[in-house]
């Protein structure tokens, strides 16, 4: 799908908006890592005085999206120009196919929901800061949009079209590497709102002394060309990369060659050449090639100073260096706590020179004041040493889960054995006159599907979910979790059972059934009977919960006795589907002075830290440590680290996974014809792979 001109549409939005999907960072993708998409949004906001810029964020990233992913991706779009986030998405409930609708889901059902306020408050503060003041850039980059139109065909592709897109992506990426401040210009917007005022190229509320034609820019819209002519004659500066344009409105035109000979038209061979010719003093990064990581910045002008937001998009390298800009003093504004503190700088001739050191996925929000602020005494640098502690005791917080996603099905006179639940659902809907689950394949018009709930006698189906139980399992702990618990008859080994009043698991609308009295050692089956058929009867997995471990079989999994947990992957310790918290606990003698907890090798969406029963904070991103000084006691202390998993392992997808970071409804639709062996399920490693450490001051 090709959009004709995104920026042209943004010009008419009161809150320009973009949708950033997935959890990938390919430079040439249309999502995270695609600088152009967000810079278009921000540029139009600058040019039209729009205070807010909206992004729908995190959709289709999968249930496994971590706090570090969310912070990193959010920081990236905020530093490029977003300042208002609409998180994708909050499910009213997870029943049926809803849980497959481009997850992540953000609500009470999600295992990490209890810790999410930390991130929400962080982005709320960033939203305030980065919608304050104005971003004022002096350089305009013309987009090669009309050039791409020359190569576009609805019936066949042209290699040059992809080449232009890749070239422009790479060009913007290199500008960001050198921290060049610029806006993008859309020729369609220039047609309606462009002008020249003196030696300034104007788009509505913004004016630019420098215009850049990027590589592969081959065509001018007629109005743009006329403005460029006037701009050059009035003293404006054009930098042209590569071959000069040769077309106006898609036709060869010698006038382009004539203006390219103008004294203010400069042929430019590469970005380094451009850097040597333009003024970067507004934000001057020293020695950018040695900074490391993947650094971005945004600078916004206020009446009494400037806001600077720095982010490091890399997950593996620090970004470390120095920059200078106009100002007299600097404060760090902590977007996690709302506190501000003095930032040591070197001031000279109304400019400040400051250093930064951002860990992977790190960020820093600064206020550079025009006024001298008396410095506060620097905090003494604390030297930490690792405590010697006993190994953590480890405990599962919630019951273990088994996801049953293969069924035996009877619908009408047809019987099917060992088929994937979604395949079974298709057969049910087809038998009742639908090509697919109507809640999946279409959008209900008014009450269209609700009114279709008129199935007669003789319709319906029965689905059976088999599972084996080994010797020694704590049968008394076993429960079943079934969606829409009052919709159908539920049986365990032929005995009808009712949901436990007031109990739920995973989602408020899902029922919990006591199966402890009916489960036997050996083969068991949970059955659901739907007679007559209902429009609400979406076949989904059923879950067994309780105190057990799981052992992979040639087909699926077997319940076996629960064993003690150790550090290492949960899925290798009988918890392949477990989504919630595991508690790692240490008891240590009296602590005084600065103390911090540090996680070593670990996998999880987030970790919450408790000291003596009181929540001290969370660990979700590098450097994976937390100061717990104010929570420790001079007497014995109990330190608990709760590592949180995700719904990826519980809800899937478990079979049709082609790439991490992209999860769509189709990811859940396909699976092997018969249930594969347990080890073939696609599951993630969660847990502390190494014990956590406690550091105290020397």
Which positions does each model-derived feature cover?
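A cytosolic small-molecule/anion-sensing beta-strand core signal
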Residues: 611
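Extended, low-complexity, turn-rich repeat/linker tracts enriched in Gly/Pro/Ser/Thr and Asp/Glu
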Residues: 484-490, 601-608
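Carbohydrate-binding surfaces of carbohydrate-active enzymes
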Residues: 1-16, 20-479, 483-485, 490-538, ...
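C-terminal structured "cap/appendage" subdomains that terminate the fold
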Residues: 198-199, 214, 223-224, 254, ...
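Hydrophobic core residues within well-ordered beta-strands of beta-rich domains
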Residues: 461-463, 544, 582-584, 688
């Amino acid at each position: 799908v090709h959009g004709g001109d995104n920026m042209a549409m943004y010009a008419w939005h009161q809150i320009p908006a973009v949708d950033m999907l997935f959890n990938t960072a390919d430079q040439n993708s249309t999502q995270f890592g695609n600088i152009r998409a967000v810079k278009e949004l921000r540029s139009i906001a600058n040019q039209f005085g729009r205070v807010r810029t909206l992004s729908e964020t995190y959709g289709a990233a999968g249930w496994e999206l971590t706090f570090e992913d969310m912070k990193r991706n959010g920081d990236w779009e905020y530093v490029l120009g977003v300042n208002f986030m609409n998180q994708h998405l909050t499910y009213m409930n997870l029943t049926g196919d809803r849980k497959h609708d481009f997850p992540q889901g953000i609500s009470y059902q999600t295992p990490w929901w209890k810790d999410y306020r930390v991130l929400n408050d962080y982005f709320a503060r960033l939203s305030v800061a980065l919608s304050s003041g104005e971003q004022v850039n002096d350089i305009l980059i013309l987009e090669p949009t009309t050039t791409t139109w020359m190569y576009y065909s609805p019936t066949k592709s042209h290699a040059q079209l992809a080449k232009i897109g890749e070239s422009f992506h790479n060009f913007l990426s290199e500008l960001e590497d050198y921290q060049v401040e610029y806006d993008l210009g859309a020729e369609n917007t220039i047609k309606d709102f462009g002008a020249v005022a003196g030696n300034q190229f104007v788009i509505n509320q913004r004016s630019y002394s420098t215009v850049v034609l990027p590589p592969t820019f081959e065509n001018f819209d007629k109005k743009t060309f006329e403005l460029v002519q006037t701009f050059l004659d009035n003293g404006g500066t054009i930098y042209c990369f590569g071959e000069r344009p040769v077309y106006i409105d898609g036709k060869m035109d010698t006038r382009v060659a004539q203006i390219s000979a103008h004294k203010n038209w400069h042929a430019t061979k590469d970005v380094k050449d451009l850097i040597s010719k333009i003024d970067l003093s507004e934000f001057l990064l020293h020695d950018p090639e040695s900074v490391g990581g993947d650094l971005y910045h945004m600078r916004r002008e206020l009446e009494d100073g400037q806001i600077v937001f720095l982010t490091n998009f890399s997950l593996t390298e620090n970004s470390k260096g120095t920059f200078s800009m106009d100002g007299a003093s600097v404060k760090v504004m902590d977007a996690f706590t709302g506190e501000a503190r003095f930032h040591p700088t070197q001031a000279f001739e109304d400019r400040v020179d400051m250093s930064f050191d951002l860990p992977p996925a790190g960020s820093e929000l600064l206020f550079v004041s025009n006024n001298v602020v008396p410095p506060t005494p620097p905090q003494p640098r604390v030297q930490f040493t690792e405590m010697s502690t006993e190994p953590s005791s480890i405990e599962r917080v919630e019951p273990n889960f088994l996801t049953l996603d293969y069924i035996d099905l009877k619908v009408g006179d047809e019987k099917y054995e060992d088929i994937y639940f979604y395949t079974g659902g298709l057969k049910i809907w087809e038998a009742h006159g639908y090509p697919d689950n109507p809640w999946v394949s279409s959008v209900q018009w008014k009450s269209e599907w609700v009114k279709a709930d008129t199935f007669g006698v003789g319709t319906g189906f029965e689905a059976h979910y088999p599972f084996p139980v080994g010797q020694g399992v704590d049968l008394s702990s076993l429960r079943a979790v079934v969606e829409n618990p009052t919709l159908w008859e539920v049986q365990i080994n032929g005995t009808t059972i009712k949901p436990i009043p007031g109990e739920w698991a995973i989602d408020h609308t899902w029922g919990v059934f006591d199966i402890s009295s009916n489960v036997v050692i050996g083969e068991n089956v949970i059955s659901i009977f739907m007679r007559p058929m209902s429009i609400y009867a979406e076949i989904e997995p059923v879950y067994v919960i309780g105190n057990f471990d799981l052992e992979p079989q040639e087909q699926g999994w077997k319940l076996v006795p629960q064993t003690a947990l150790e550090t290492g992957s949960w899925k290798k310790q009988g918890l392949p589907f477990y989504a919630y918290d595991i508690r790692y606990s240490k008891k240590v003698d009296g602590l005084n002075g600065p103390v911090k907890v540090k996680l070593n090798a670990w996998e999880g969406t987030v970790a919450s830290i408790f000291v003596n029963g009181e929540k001290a904070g969370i660990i979700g991103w590098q450097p994976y440590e937390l100061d717990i000084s104010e929570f420790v006691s001079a007497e014995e202390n109990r330190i608990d680290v709760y590592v949180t998993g995700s719904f990826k392992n519980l809800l899937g997808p478990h079979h049709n996974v082609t790439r991490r970071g992209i999860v769509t409804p189709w990811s859940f639709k396909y699976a092997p014809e018969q249930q594969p062996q347990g080890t073939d399920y696609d599951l993630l490693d969660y847990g502390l792979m190494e014990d956590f450490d406690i550091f105290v001051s020397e």
